[in-house]
């Protein structure tokens, strides 16, 4: 009798476990979420690299249970988007993911990474956009093995969302760093943006060729309004126009690329997320979003707490929700939540084009 009851208990446990897995999967609006980007969304891929661009130390992650490699006090935008999409947990970093975990998605983002190969080299090792795409191609081979054949894998991957956001470092750690790079002497801002978009398009088409069909492309934020940029501004409050103007040239071309890619690939859907506009709204109307400090980092050194970014063991500000910026370059969790929510569910017509992520997920 005891053996009989034991067997039934085991069966019930297995049934409950199976039901919980199905329920967790059913809650997600898409089967998987793949992330490509830089330090704005890196969640640990740089931890094992020989690089200055790392954040696996306190006080990074102070509101996340400890440092993980995220460049914020807490969640990044893609963490919040994963929650909004219904995933039961955050998308794992490529350098830690294993087995069937990849079926929920992978984060390939790398701090200091750019669209151009040389971008960020002065900071050490990083995984460029093309390197991230190669890592994704390895993942696809693993998905094929897990699902049994290429047809099943293709059907699975076409329903996933692919978040791509690069370009900031191609300006911060390339074009506007003439001591290390010659790009600003080789190209006008218009020419440089054309070069970046051409390279960007090549990698997006490579992702398409490996099964990606739902793309959310994030534009560059208001980099000229970061504490690091403002530290060099005469009054410490006026955004640096030459940086923002160059970024907007890129953003306008990226939005046009969305139209081009949608025309070239009718079986796919590409959308543009206006990170610049959302960021400008927070900076221009801080009280509306609960912010009090828009021109300084919560953790950093020097003017605007932005000349040197957050150092190991440094004590950050107390009221982190009152700050737009966590350090010299990166948003706080509070700002990331706003950006993510407006990317997922646009609050104005300019937030996303031609649709937001919630509608993209429904396709």
Curated annotation (Swiss-Prot):
Q: Which residues form the signal peptide?
A: 1-24
Annotated GO CC locations: apoplast; chloroplast thylakoid; nucleus
Q: Which cysteines are joined by disulfide bonds?
A: none
Gene Ontology biological process: lipid catabolic process
Q: What is its EC number?
A: 3.1.1.-
Q: Does the keyword Lipid metabolism apply?
A: yes
Q: Where in the cell is it found?
A: Secreted
Q: Which InterPro entries does the UniProt entry name for this protein? A: GDSL (IPR001087), GDSL_esterase/lipase (IPR051238), SGNH_hydro_sf (IPR036514), SGNH_plant_lipase-like (IPR035669)
Any one GO molecular-function label of the UniProt entry: hydrolase activity, acting on ester bonds
Q: Which UniProt keywords apply?
A: Hydrolase, Lipid degradation, Lipid metabolism, Secreted, Signal
Q: Where is the catalytic site?
A: 39, 327, 330
Q: Which Pfam families match?
A: Lipase_GDSL
Q: What is its main location?
A: secreted
Q: Tell me the enzyme class.
A: hydrolase
Cross-referenced PANTHER family = (RAPE) HYPOTHETICAL PROTEIN (PTHR45650:SF67), GDSL-LIKE LIPASE/ACYLHYDROLASE-RELATED (PTHR45650)
Family listed? Belongs to the 'GDSL' lipolytic enzyme family.
The protein here is known as GDSL esterase/lipase At1g29670
């Amino acid at each position: 009798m005891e053996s009989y009851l034991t067997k039934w208990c085991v069966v019930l446990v297995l049934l409950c476990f199976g039901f919980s897995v199905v329920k967790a999967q059913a809650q997600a609006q898409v089967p998987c979420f793949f992330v490509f980007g830089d330090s704005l969304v890196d969640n640990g891929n740089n931890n094992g690299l020989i690089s200055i661009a790392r954040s696996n130390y306190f006080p990074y992650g102070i509101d996340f249970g400890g440092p993980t490699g995220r460049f914020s006090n807490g969640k990044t935008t893609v963490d919040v988007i994963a929650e909004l999409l219904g995933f039961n947990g955050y998308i794992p970093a490529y350098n830690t993911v294993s087995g069937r975990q990849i079926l929920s998605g992978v984060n390939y983002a790398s701090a200091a990474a750019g669209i151009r190969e040389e971008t960020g080299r002065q900071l050490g090792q990083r995984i460029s956009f093309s390197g991230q795409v190669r890592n994704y191609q390895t993942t696809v081979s693993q998905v094929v093995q897990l699902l049994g054949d290429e047809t099943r894998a293709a059907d699975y991957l076409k329903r996933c969302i692919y978040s791509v956001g690069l370009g900031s470092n191609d300006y911060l750690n390339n074009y506007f760093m003439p001591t290390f790079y010659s790009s600003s002497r080789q190209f006008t801002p218009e020419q440089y943006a054309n070069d970046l978009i051409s390279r960007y398009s090549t990698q997006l088409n490579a992702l398409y060729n490996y099964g990606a069909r739902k793309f959310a492309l994030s534009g560059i934020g208001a980099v000229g309004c970061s504490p690091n940029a403002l530290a060099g501004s005469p009054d410490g409050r006026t955004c640096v126009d030459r940086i923002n103007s160059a970024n907007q040239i890129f953003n306008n071309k990226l939005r046009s690329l969305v139209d081009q890619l949608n025309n070239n690939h009718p079986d796919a859907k590409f959308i543009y997320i206006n990170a610049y506009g959302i960021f400008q709204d927070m900076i221009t109307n801080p009280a509306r979003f609960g912010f009090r400090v828009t021109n300084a980092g919560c953790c950093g050194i020097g003017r605007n707490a932005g000349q040197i970014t957050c150092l190991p063991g440094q004590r950050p500000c107390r009221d982190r929700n009152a700050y737009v910026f966590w350090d010299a370059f990166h948003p706080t969790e509070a700002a990331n939540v706003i950006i993510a929510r407006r990317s997922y569910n646009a609050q104005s017509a300019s937030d996303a084009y031609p649709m937001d992520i919630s509608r993209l997920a429904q396709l």
